[in-house]
């Protein structure tokens, strides 16, 4: 199911982006 895979990738990418932004703000 490519949709499930894309959702998982999007979730991981969002998590990485969020942690990166949080790191820059500190």
Swiss-Prot record:
Tissue: Expressed by the skin glands.
Localization terms from the record: Secreted
Record carries keyword Secreted: yes
GO cellular component terms listed in the entry, alphabetical order: extracellular region
Alphabetized UniProt keyword annotations: Antibiotic, Antimicrobial, Cytolysis, Secreted
Iron is among the record's keywords: no
Entry's Gene Ontology BP terms: defense response to bacterium; killing of cells of another organism
Subunit structure: Exists as aggregates of 3-4 molecules.
Job description of the protein: Thanks to its amphiphilic alpha-helice(s), it may integrate into membrane phospholipids, leading to lysis of the membrane. Has no substantial hemolytic activity. Has antibacterial activity with a broad spectrum against various species of bacteria including both Gram-positive and Gram-negative groups.
Family of the protein in this entry: Belongs to the grammistin family. Group 3 subfamily.
Protein name in UniProt: Grammistin Gs C
């Amino acid at each position: 199911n490519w949709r499930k895979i894309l959702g998982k990738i999007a979730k991981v990418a969002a998590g990485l982006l969020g942690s990166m932004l949080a790191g820059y703000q500190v």
